[in-house]
């Protein structure tokens, strides 16, 4: 009997919804990345893109533990000399609540073309309204 090898065009991708309200950022991000990579499926293979789509709601209400609300700093560079900018978590969650979860999840995905394809299946919304009702997403309840 031959070994089954998963192919990305054969595997059906499903849509999942995760509510981020009062969830810890790191623990939430590990669950999201697990579904994007496809490790929850029995057909998982590290060289094949078989992960699912993930919709994250209420990104504005995600929490962090300890003093990270004030101490965690996000850096970016404008491209100009001396153009390094920084925002702490509190300001970042007020200005760009979706980016906080996107940055955390992107760091947990594989680097390279396969990881970029996985990252494209992540949808993050600051409120509890999304535009993906036609895909009939399944709700995932996580404890973290």
UniProtKB/Swiss-Prot annotation:
GO cellular component, one term: cytosolic large ribosomal subunit
Record key words, sorted: Ribonucleoprotein, Ribosomal protein
Any single Pfam family the record assigns to this protein: Ribosomal_L13
InterPro entries on file: Ribosomal_uL13, Ribosomal_uL13_bac-type, Ribosomal_uL13_CS, Ribosomal_uL13_sf
CDD domains on file: Ribosomal_L13
Source domain of life: Bacteria
Cysteine-cysteine disulfides: none
GO MF terms held by the record: mRNA binding; structural constituent of ribosome
GO biological process terms held by the UniProt record: negative regulation of translation; translation
Family, similarity comment: Belongs to the universal ribosomal protein uL13 family.
Function: This protein is one of the early assembly proteins of the 50S ribosomal subunit, although it is not seen to bind rRNA by itself. It is important during the early stages of 50S assembly.
Subunit structure and binding partners: Part of the 50S ribosomal subunit.
Name listed for the protein in its UniProt record: Large ribosomal subunit protein uL13
Highest classification ranks of the organism: Bacteria, Pseudomonadati, Pseudomonadota, Gammaproteobacteria, Enterobacterales
């Amino acid at each position: 009997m031959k070994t089954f090898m998963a192919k990305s065009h054969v595997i059906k991708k499903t849509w999942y919804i995760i509510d981020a309200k009062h969830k810890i950022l790191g623990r939430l991000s590990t669950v999201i990345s697990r579904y994007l990579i496809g490790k929850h499926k029995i057909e998982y293979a590290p060289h094949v893109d078989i992960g699912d789509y993930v919709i994250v709601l209420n990104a504005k209400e995600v929490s962090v533990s300890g003093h990270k609300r004030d101490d965690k700093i996000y850096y970016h560079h404008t491209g100009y000399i001396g153009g390094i900018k920084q925002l702490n978590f509190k300001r970042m969650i007020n200005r760009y609540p979706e980016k906080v979860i996107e940055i955390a999840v992107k760091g947990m995905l594989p680097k390279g073309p396969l990881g970029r394809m996985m990252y494209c299946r992540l949808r993050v919304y600051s409120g509890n309204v999304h535009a993906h009702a036609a895909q009939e997403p399944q709700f995932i309840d996580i404890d973290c």
